[in-house]
Amino acid sequence: MERCIAQARKYYAMKGELPFKEDYLKQDAIALNVQRACELCIDIANHLIKTKKLGLPQDSKDSFSLLQRGGLINEAMMASLRAMVGFRNILVHQYQKLDLDIMGDIIEHRLDALLDFANTALAASD
């Protein structure tokens, strides 16, 4: 997960010949790494749910709700992770055109939530 996040940040910061909004290769590289990091969080969440016997999530977003109800993450972390799953769903299923301003905001301000979750999950699994 750390590598995926580092790669996404690296690609975002790279200066290229094209502006970010026109550099589809850079956008795809970032999207793939963010998607992978989100999917790792979902996998970790589902593993914790199973080992702690917290129930059966109805979907990926619900995994984080179950962890919050089980006392393993706080409400702010749950909300942040559910939002990241929503962004991941847009990346994977292309529900709508990718909003590059949102992608930029995620790279600049929201990826640490995934790392925070990984650390929280690691502590909870002890």
Q: Positions of the model-derived regions?
A:
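Solvent-exposed interaction patches of small proteins and small membrane subunits
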Residues: 1-126
